[in-house]
Amino acid sequence: MAGPLPPLNQEPAFQKLQEYYDSKAKDLNIKDLFVKDSKRFSKYSLRLHTQNDGEILLDYSKNRINDEVWDLLLALAKVRRVNAARDAMFSGQHINITENRAVLHTALRNRGTDPVLVDDKDVMPDVRAELAHMKEFTNMVISGVWRGCTGKQITDVVNIGIGGSDLGPLMVTEALKPYGKGLHSHFVSNIDGTHLAEVLKKVNYETTLFIVASKTFTTQETITNATSAKTWLLEHSKEPESVAKHFVALSTNKEKVTEFGIDSTNMFGFWDWVGGRYSLWSAIGLSICLSIGFENFEQLLDGAHFMDNHFKTTPFEKNAPVILALLGVWYSNFFKAETHALLPYDQYLHRFAAYFQQGDMESNGKFVSKSGKPVKYSTGPIVWGEPGTNGQHAFYQLIHQGTRLIPCDFIAPAQTHNPIAGGKHHKILLSNFLAQTEALMAGKTVDEARTELSKAGLCGNELDNLLPHKVFVGNRPTNSIVVKKVSPFTLGALIALYEHKIFVQGIIWDINSFDQWGVELGKQLAKAIEPELDHCNEVSTHDSSTNGLINFIKANWK
């Protein structure tokens, strides 16, 4: 087995990129690159052909790259052993080194017949059994066979979870609303009682099903919310037996689940090789199944499996996740870009950026390498975004004319689920999608701005004073991803695309993308502070700021 990787900044392939950046990067003007190469779009774009959901287009031609840069980036991926790391993940090796675990969310959506081994055991029979359990339960609820404690059919589903037990199911349920089967979906994550209280105002105890998503069934926020929801149910039903009719668990802790009052036959399990932020493909996706039906959930799995196969089998130069990953490394480690914007031009995808805030920032927000040594280069970026065209009227100003370089991914469907006004809305939406990447690339020169102002009737000092404010530097990099339509299949493919992009970047940076120790420290301190809020005495056991905050809150508690 090959030894550890050298620090990235000591890698000869990285140093060659640094030399190129230092000497030639200032000459990489995207607009000029198109002028010089009439085939640039075809050279720097991919079309992925799906069986039933059309093509997926990735256009990465509007980036600050040329053939020389691209060859150097591909060479970097090879010397950082991305191939070997990818194979290790898919083969069930324990690549999560700090927790000594395999990383096999890909097994959850494996639609083939080949075994998937973890510690010499084929996990696929267990995966298929859990999917069958989810299918049976989903069909019972949607068909009305499963009923509440008073015999009424379920109309509302409340998913209680946090982090990966909330963000993924919420994002997918919102994205696939057009495929809904009639149940109303609600999500409660925040320990702030307002979140649960507002949901409970909208539902009827007789027709509501609660899903408690906690692997250990001990997650503080989730179990506190679930216990309060159970209290609310019992206040209305007056019957302890009603809990079993209105609660199911996504957990592996049978003892805690049954103690809560949930029938263990209504417990859906998953495994320690499923990370929270990759768990929507598992039983954590039960709320997705109940929203869109199990057949559509299978299509979601199919789409992800399609992208898994693409990632596994395609050479780097045509491999969509690798391409996105390398572009991100180029901007983060050489141009010092600190953020990356995800900008879906589809309102159904309004939670897509929030989902990958966790997916990316929790995975690659690390400052030590796998060997435990602090790195001396940038790792995970800040990920953010909002749907178009809302973002255009909020933060695009900074992307266009600010001092920071912000690489952006624009995502759009060619077809809409809602062609109202004869498709006029969608045509306007897509025209904005197309215009923004062109504008970010081309900008507006001084001469162009002067001509525009002259045509508007300005001249002299008035024109000269306004002129610099109307100039756009341009040369802002973007990727465009276009699907035929947002469907379960294409959404599954998009999610897997970004999962694998994040993985590849983690390999290049030599960090463990599959733990999240940064979540723990705040939890530990919160447990110490909580009892200090139970009494009215002043606190002096912390730093003066924390003491001051605690004492101010206690003084204003009532």
Curated annotation (Swiss-Prot):
It comes from Drosophila simulans. It is found in: Cytoplasm. One of its GO terms (cellular component) is cytosol. This is Glucose-6-phosphate isomerase. Pathway: Carbohydrate degradation; glycolysis; D-glyceraldehyde 3-phosphate and glycerone phosphate from D-glucose: step 2/4. Keywords: Cytoplasm, Gluconeogenesis, Glycolysis, Isomerase. One of its GO terms (molecular function) is monosaccharide binding. It comes from the Eukaryota. It holds the Pfam family PGI. It catalyses: alpha-D-glucose 6-phosphate = beta-D-fructose 6-phosphate. HAMAP family: G6P_isomerase (MF_00473). The active site is at E362 (proton donor), H393, K523. Its EC number is 5.3.1.9.
